[in-house]
Amino acid sequence: MSELPVTHLNFNQDTSCVALGLMTGYKIVNIQLKFGKCCCYNDDSINLIEMLYTTSLIVMTPLGNEIGSSPRELKIKNTKTNSTICSLFFPTTILNIKLTRDHLIVVLENQIYIYEIKTMKLLQTIKTDSNPLGLCAVSYDQETNLLAFPSPPKAKDALASMRSSSGNAKSTHAAGTSHNSHNGANKGTVFKGDLILFDLNKFQPIMAISAHKNDIAAVAFSADGTLISTASHKGTIVRVFDTNTGVKLFQFRRGSYPTKIYSLQFSLDNKYVLATSSSMTVHIFRLGEDEALETKHKKRIKTINEEPSAVAAAAIAAAREASNNGGETTTTTTAAAATSGPRENGGEDDDSDSMDDDLDVDDDDDNEDDCDDDDDETPVKQRKLSQGSSNSYASINSEDINSPVIDQNRLSVARIIRRQSQNLGRKAAQKMGDYLPSRFSSILEPTRHFASIKVEAKHKDVKSIATINNSQHDIISLQYDSRDNMDANLLQINVVTSEGMLYIYGLDSERGGDCILLNLYSLIDE
């Protein structure tokens, strides 16, 4: 990261602005209505920076390179006057900060501090297990008002014995069916990819979601707080859960080879999820509305209600009691508090070993299929609809307006071969989908991304974040059939990188496929 000019990059809550932490201060750029309007300030080298919508309030932490600065210090500043409102010091390095209209959340490796933003009164301190990435997410909707953070790892056989002796107390976790929860499990198997959902209105943990078997690398709430998306350290699977029930609504295969997921981002209308990764690809997953999935989710909820977990309910109750005991402001998240009740089999498909493909220059086109999907019987309709959610490769000479967009600049022999192979699998799945169990049809036809982007970076280890908006610039791409078609269907993808570049891509909301580069800007040049 020493070669890169940007030390930290972050969108504000409504993704209208981007804040850049620099070695010489920070910069805020409006990337929507008043595109190009920016504020630049000279300061210490910045480690973290967080905006509060488009207000003049920002929160930052320094890298600590300068004399007198420390990564344990948090500064709240007014950008209009470039003055420091207040400064706080913490016992260890600050790993993450989040701002809402009501709260300031500061994440350390083993603690989370929650402050009231108006008075800076400390409202709650949550003790957590080791969280070296400072991973957390906040819903900005004041009604849902949730905080998510990783739960401590726990042993699977210990959970089984605890559940068997806990009676039939009501469970607060609803992450799916438990028909394959413990089949074939080895003693001492540890699950690391669980999330705690914490209510910021009641200051109580309300749910533990079994998201992945591996450690979680990225997590994000939707704008209304009703959905949460996760990815593990392996980076091959992206999942979307309902925050009200904990039920897994969607599962997508990003690729087959491990990569680091840098960020997840929902569109404001909850129709898409974007994932950026160390392979410099951006994957766009479409959250389709088919009734077959709804039927599957209702069956899972019913199963959960019939087989509740007493351990989760008891742990949550204990945490609430500790939170309300004599005005205590500390909640300790233990392994029991993170107990997630019935566990989905879907969490185990992150662990299949795979080898890097030397021919693979475009990670979004990996061809290894997901052979560890849920064992639940998937309706035929879902298997057929999943074809529309995959980035199928149409013939270059095809004039089908519904076929995915193909970027000629990304064309390669390896890519064509992989896509032809995937098309054969999909055709086989369509022909035999009515006769094969869903587990086998999912091998032939996994649910993949709807569209993708390959960002051309000049350096290695370039981080990126991305967001999706309606088209706002009159930039015509020759890749589209007509101006009218472009205007009707075009969505705008903004990708910001730690090289200080803003890339603007066009996504055809009907066809998907490759997103076309419309323009690019340098955000750090004067």
UniProtKB/Swiss-Prot annotation:
Taken from the UniProt entry, a GO cellular component term is: cytosol
Entry-linked PROSITE patterns: WD_REPEATS_REGION
Report biased composition (Polar residues) as residue ranges.
385-397
Q: Where are the WD repeats?
A: 211-251, 256-295, 470-515
Instruction: List the biased-composition ranges (Low complexity).
Output: 329-339
Acidic residues biased stretches? 347-377
Q: Where does the record place it?
A: Preautophagosomal structure membrane; Vacuole membrane; Endosome membrane
Answer yes or no on keyword Transport.
yes
Name the job this protein performs.
Answer: The PI(3,5)P2 regulatory complex regulates both the synthesis and turnover of phosphatidylinositol 3,5-bisphosphate (PtdIns(3,5)P2). Necessary for proper vacuole morphology. Plays an important role in osmotically-induced vacuole fragmentation. Required for cytoplasm to vacuole transport (Cvt) vesicle formation, pexophagy and starvation-induced autophagy. Involved in correct ATG9 trafficking to the pre-autophagosomal structure. Might also be involved in premeiotic DNA replication.
State how it assembles. Component of the PI(3,5)P2 regulatory complex.
What is the protein's name according to its record?
Answer: Autophagy-related protein 18
Species classification: Eukaryota, Fungi, Dikarya, Ascomycota, Saccharomycotina
Gene designation per UniProt: ATG18
